[in-house]
């Protein structure tokens, strides 16, 4: 829980934005009928940042991720997204609906991200898939059908597929909800490596305060649709 008086210098103020951003939300609101899911959100996310979205259930984290992913249009305000700034930018998502093919194997689902323009050949892609599968403990299950996998294994498959697409940014909504502590940390260690070595921007909605404390990053804390704090995670 966020406690005490939060400093305001971490907040993004209108008109003060460095133009080298990936995402920029300007006074953005989202309404579902009479329900206001996001209220006047002002947020800028820069390349290579790790941003944890925090807040109680119903605070607007999923709605914010859907806006950032281009799946949800704001009711008012403006959202500038990576693909609008450069065709080189690509955003991968791992949301609660993992969009896996249940009758296909783990490996089949990972092949869905293959793009010949990103890899020299299929062998290169498979080696990357193999490496990530070993790191996350999925390798021995590559031939298992998704229908026969538990929730944690499904989340890992979805994450590997997302990383194989070589995204500029990764949006994740509680992607460790079915994983134990050890596997959660292992997953984020892999993501942290991608952040440091490849400049991957990570935006991660989570209730896991211990995970946030273990990895460097910023937080954007939402409450009742309002962004009440954006800045360093030392106020967790």
Predicted regions and their residues:
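Hydrophobic anchor residue at the start of the ABC signature
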Residues: 159
């Amino acid at each position: 829980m966020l406690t005490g008086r939060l400093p305001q210098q971490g907040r993004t103020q209108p008109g003060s934005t460095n133009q080298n951003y990936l995402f920029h939300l300007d006074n953005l609101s989202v309404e579902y009928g009479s329900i206001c899911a996001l209220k006047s959100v002002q947020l800028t996310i820069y390349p290579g940042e790790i941003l944890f979205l925090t807040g109680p259930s119903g605070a607007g984290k999923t709605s914010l991720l859907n806006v950032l992913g281009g799946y949800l249009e704001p009711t008012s305000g403006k959202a500038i997204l990576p693909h609008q700034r450069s065709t080189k930018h690509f955003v991968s998502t791992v949301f609660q609906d993992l969009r896996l093919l249940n009758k296909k194997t783990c490996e089949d689902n990972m092949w869905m991200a293959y793009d010949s323009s990103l890899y020299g050949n299929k062998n290169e892609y498979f080696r990357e898939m193999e490496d990530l599968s070993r790191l996350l403990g999925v390798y021995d299950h590559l031939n298992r059908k998704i229908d026969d996998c538990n929730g944690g294994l499904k989340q890992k498959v979805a994450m590997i597929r997302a990383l194989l697409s070589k995204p500029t940014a990764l949006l994740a909504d509680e992607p460790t909800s079915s994983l134990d502590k050890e596997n959660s940390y292992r997953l984020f260690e892999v993501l942290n490596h991608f952040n440091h070595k490849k400049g991957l921007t990570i935006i991660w909605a989570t209730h896991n305060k211990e995970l946030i404390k273990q990895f460097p990053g910023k937080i954007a804390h939402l409450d009742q649709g309002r962004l009440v704090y954006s800045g360093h995670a030392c106020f967790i």
